[in-house]
Amino acid sequence: MRSLSLILLALATMLTPISAQFGFFDQMFGGGGGGEQEQHHGHGHGGHQRQQQNAPSDGAGYRAQYARLHCDNYLCPDTLACVHFPHHCPCPWPAHEEKVELAEGQRICVSHGGFKAGEAARKVELARKGLL
């Protein structure tokens, strides 16, 4: 009886569609679902597999979100954060990137690349001085 239960559980697990939602587009574009379409494909067992349509290859959704936002100061183009100065913009992926402020009032985001904190900024500074 136990082996039958395990077989049924394994079969149900294999037939169940799994979809990973990382929330990036919901977070980035407000999650309105505009233009998001699902396609259903039937299988021999009567099941349905959901496939989301790829994001459009143009930046129309991004531009629409950008236009809807209000910011009295500076609206960061990559994170859509409202800050006082461009070099205050946060990195889009702070868990994986280190923000480095440049002398010209700009900032760049550099991948940690497995280095300890501050090491990426040190390497950028060495490169700017021509030492790397």
UniProtKB/Swiss-Prot annotation:
TM ranges: none
* GO BP annotations, alphabetical order: ERAD pathway
Q: Which UniProt keywords apply?
A: Signal
Q: Where is the signal peptide?
A: 1-20
The record's region (Disordered) falls at 33-59
Tell me, in a sentence or two, what this protein's role is.
Probable component of the endoplasmic reticulum-associated degradation (ERAD) pathway.
Family label: Belongs to the LCL2 family.
Q: What is this protein called?
A: Long chronological lifespan protein 2
Species name: Podospora anserina (strain S / ATCC MYA-4624 / DSM 980 / FGSC 10383)
Name of the coding gene: LCL2
